[in-house]
Amino acid sequence: MCIRDRSLAFTGLGWRLLASGRRFLYAHLWMACLFALQTGALCVKAYQTGMCPIRGASEVLFFLSWTINLFYLLLGRAYRMSVLGIFTAPAIAVLTALSLLIGLYGADVQGTHDFWVTAHVGVAMMSYGAGGLAAAAGVAFCMQNECLKRRQIPGTCRLLPPIRTLEASMKRLVLVAFLLLLAGEWLGWQRHLPINGAKTSIVILLTLGYSILLWFIYRRGMPGRALAYCCVALFIASMSIFLVS
């Protein structure tokens, strides 16, 4: 729990560095330090329980925040999207805070040591993390697009990546999220794991949603603004799976 508290503090400081618009390299390094703390917390929990720490809502939310930060660090600098930390850091902070609250006041959940269950849930969480970063890119796209339409470029929009960079990043992240979601489904269905019916329905709908979106992207073409809305909508829809018990 102490490491999670420090992770939350690091997230806030990282957001301040990103929002200041100065020295994005320092902010990126700060987010990397946050990632190290998150990884440490997950390793400690895994050592204590003997399994991947994705047993209850508290651990799942913290693991999700870790995956979002992972994709941010992997793709942020590579695709000139480091500034998306302005959106990513608050999302990580909210997920970490919710994880802490649920961990403090919720009952401890006993998990299973089945490797396939752990792999299934872990890969699915990584899919949601990629979808979360795609949603962040979508929000940034809408902001940048609105600034260009008004021909007014405030300080925040000056820091955002170009429209084409954001659009290309959304396409890549949607594809990554879709492939990871398929991999998670395969791990679950290959071993005939007992999965909640409502959650299965949500995952099937998400798969259809990503499939249709990718078909439009690569076969018919899709305006960037519509793509941004779809990325945000799909991420919100994926979060509904945590509301189902």
Language-model features: where?
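Conserved small/polar residues in nucleotide/adenosyl-binding loops
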Residues: 1-5
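Membrane-interface helix-loop-helix modules in multi-pass inner-membrane proteins
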Residues: 38-88, 186-204
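Short aromatic-rich membrane-water interface segments that cap or initiate transmembrane helices
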Residues: 56, 67, 112-129, 161-169
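A mid-sequence, solvent-exposed acidic-amphipathic segment
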Residues: 147-190
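Interfacial loop-to-transmembrane junctions
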Residues: 216-236
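Juxtamembrane boundary at the C-terminal end of a transmembrane helix
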Residues: 240-245
